[in-house]
Amino acid sequence: MDYRKLKSGSDVRGVAVGEGATLTPDVAKTLGMAFARYVAGKTGKPVERVSIALGRDSRVSGPQLLEAAAQGIASAGAKAVDYGMCTTPAMYMAILTDGFRPDGSIMVTASHHPWQLNGLKFFTAEGGLGFHELDEVLDLAQSLETESPRATGEIVSTQTRTTKSSRTTT
């Protein structure tokens, strides 16, 4: 798999449904692992202290790709936090808003593109990854493609916390 072929500007995009799929769960898992390691390098933190938030839109392939990316993050040794269905701005704002403040985030979406496509948008505290930063993640993913996961991080969901918060405010 040539990960650079998934590049669409500063995002990753590919066919996620049907024959000829290029953005598969295995690819999303490798990209999650690569992004966790990229963020660790950028923040200077050990990967075991890195946390990455994940969200998705309503596309049919979203839940599977989000879960795969979360598994990749955890297999790198980092913490993956599943925000479930949310907006792209929410994934960036999660990094900046007091409270959890993950070190990075991934939004699983293909924006306005046809339903069979999907993609990944990557964010750090500086904003969405730029063209060259995405190249770093894709090159890292390429080098990790055959690597077996060694570390085990954690995958958590915000859904329980949100439900509890909703109950206490009524």
Positions of PLM-derived features:
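Ferredoxin-reductase
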Residues: G44-A125
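An N-terminal, well-structured beta->alpha segment
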Residues: M1-A69, S75, S157-T170
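Generic, ordered loop/turn and secondary-structure boundary motif
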Residues: K7-S8, R13-A16, C86, K121-F123, ...
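Short, charged, low-complexity patches
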Residues: T24-A28, G84, L134
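Generic secondary-structure signature for well-ordered alpha-helical cores
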Residues: R37-G41, A78, D139-T146
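Pocket-edge positions in alpha/beta enzyme catalytic cores
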Residues: G20-L23, Y83, L129
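Gly/Ser/Thr-enriched, mixed-charge loops and adjacent short helices
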Residues: N118-T170
